[in-house]
Regions:
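Glycoside hydrolase catalytic-domain groove-lining segments
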Residues: 250, 254-317
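Aromatic-lined carbohydrate-recognition surfaces of secreted/lumenal glycan-active proteins
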Residues: 173-179, 204-244, 298-311, 347-352
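Boundary/entry segment of secreted carbohydrate-active catalytic domains
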Residues: 26-79
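Bacterial Sec-dependent N-terminal signal peptides
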Residues: 1-26
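Active-site clefts of carbohydrate-active enzymes
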Residues: 183-192, 264, 294-332, 349-368
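Substrate-binding cleft and catalytic face of glycoside hydrolase catalytic domains
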Residues: 57-199, 221-228, 267
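Aromatic-rich peripheral "rim/lid" segments of glycoside hydrolase catalytic domains that contact
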Residues: 50-52, 81-115, 130-139, 319-323, ...
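Alpha-helical scaffolding within the catalytic cores
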Residues: 53-58, 94-104, 236-251, 282-292, ...
Length: 420
């Protein structure tokens, strides 16, 4: 009898441990996949430290920092401006590029979230050797033709279909979008003159076509446990607040994208204190959101910060000649806390490795790891934030046997030691 009781007790304990283990595993997966809001990106890195392509090296560095989000670029410039991936003449579309071994390698890494600048090969006009012309990436200046509209739709649809089929069952979240839309609308970079009405019309059509291609792929392609969204990026919010023509005022109200990205330099560069940052950035975020139509099926706010940042070395007349890494870290914390409090689903620093050079060839210092391989204070802020977040989530689960609400996480996050 005693032996039977001991055996029963042992089996009961083992069963309890098994159940607890299953419970812990369930929550650990949710913790690994959690949206930690803050992150970074890798586009156009000017240096590297391994024999891998700069895309793969920087993606691994971002993952090693603790981020489960990767922002990157896919375009016909993959081999010279964006990355040092070897040129391959057989790559003629975004889907071809998605199958390229370096691209596939980063898609196979254990990132949960991917944000991708997606520019169609079918819309691209090759630049003269050694020249970069952003207008060559688009065909909607003075209007988008039916021919280019059809080609645009087909290429984005095919990429969307490929991602849904290839990564079905992985739980990954893909977001396709564009770089700073106002510099497509004003492709000559002249913000002083009115936007061309025909270009406004053409850009509106381009963005609608891309959203429809994503929507149609999601309806038609069988898939499970993989998500795909489309976003539009805006940037000249100061013009918007002045009532001038820009993507926010002239195009966004006529669209209904899944998400909107704000490349936020016009809001985040001027403030000189945390109080001023919170007031200014909140004003800009509120204004942009006021131009967005509501959309069912997506929880939470749909406006995020796709870029913010400051280089160590100044270049333009409206910026200091030098900012210390400590000053940059302090300012970044202002942005993060304001955006987290406001409800931005993502807040992305520009960027992991620097991409801009001074006239004499020096790295300007848009980085979390510098050109000597040194990690900046802001790198450590990100790393520590991820660690604190996981501690908070595990302790919350232990107490409550469930994950926290988004608002509970945000309320806790702005008080983390890493941000204060």
């Amino acid at each position: 009898m005693k032996k039977r009781v001991i055996t029963f007790t042992l089996l009961s304990c083992m069963s309890l441990l098994f159940i607890q283990g299953k419970t812990n595993c369930k929550y650990e997966k949710k913790i690994a996949d959690y949206n930690y809001i803050i992150g970074t990106q890798t586009i156009g890195a000017k240096y590297k430290f391994t024999n891998e392509t700069n895309l793969v090296e920087t993606a691994k560095a971002i993952r090693a920092m603790g981020s489960n989000l990767l922002k990157m670029s896919m375009s016909p410039r993959y081999f010279w401006e964006n990355y040092d991936i070897p040129k391959n003449e057989s790559i003629c579309s975004l889907t071809d590029l998605a199958k390229e071994k370096n691209m596939k390698q980063v898609f196979d890494l254990d990132f949960k979230y991917y944000q991708i600048w997606a520019y169609e090969f079918s819309q691209y006009v090759v630049e003269p050797e050694g020249q970069k012309k952003d207008e060559n990436q688009i065909q909607f200046i003075n209007g988008l033709s039916d021919y280019d509209s059809i080609r645009c739709y087909r290429e984005i649809y095919d990429l969307a279909a490929h991602l849904l089929k290839t990564y079905s069952g992985t739980g990954k979240v893909f977001m396709l979008g564009n770089w700073e839309g106002d510099w497509h609308l004003r492709w000559d970079y002249d913000r002083t003159k009115p936007a061309n009405p025909k270009t406004i019309e053409g850009m509106t059509r381009w963005l609608r076509v891309r959203q429809k291609a994503v929507d149609d792929a999601k309806k038609i392609i069988p898939h499970k446990n993989v998500s795909l969204f489309y976003y539009v990026e805006v940037n000249l919010s100061d013009l918007a607040l002045d009532g001038k023509e820009c993507v926010i005022n002239s195009i966004l109200p006529n669209l209904n994208p899944d998400y909107v990205s704000f490349s936020s330099y016009t809001a985040t560069n001027p403030p000189r204190s945390e109080t001023e940052m919170e007031k200014t950035l909140t004003t800009h975020l509120n204004y942009i959101e006021s131009k967005m139509k509501p959309k069912s099926g997506i929880e939470g706010k749909r406006l995020f910060i796709g870029e913010y940042g400051w280089p160590e070395l100044g270049f333009y007349s409206n910026e200091p000649s030098y900012r210390s890494p400590e000053e940059i870290n302090k300012r970044a914390k202002w942005v993060i806390k304001t955006a987290v409090k406001w409800g931005c689903p993502f807040v992305l620093w520009w960027e992991m490795y620097n991409n801009e050079l001074t006239n004499d060839g020096k790295n300007r210092g848009f980085w979390l790891i510098n050109d000597k391989g040194e990690k900046t204070p802001l790198y450590n802020t990100h790393k520590e934030f991820y660690l604190e977040s996981k501690v908070f989530l595990r302790e919350y689960v232990k107490r409550n046997k469930k994950m926290p609400s988004e608002s509970e996480f945000r309320s806790a996050a702005i008080k983390f030691k890493s941000l204060n």
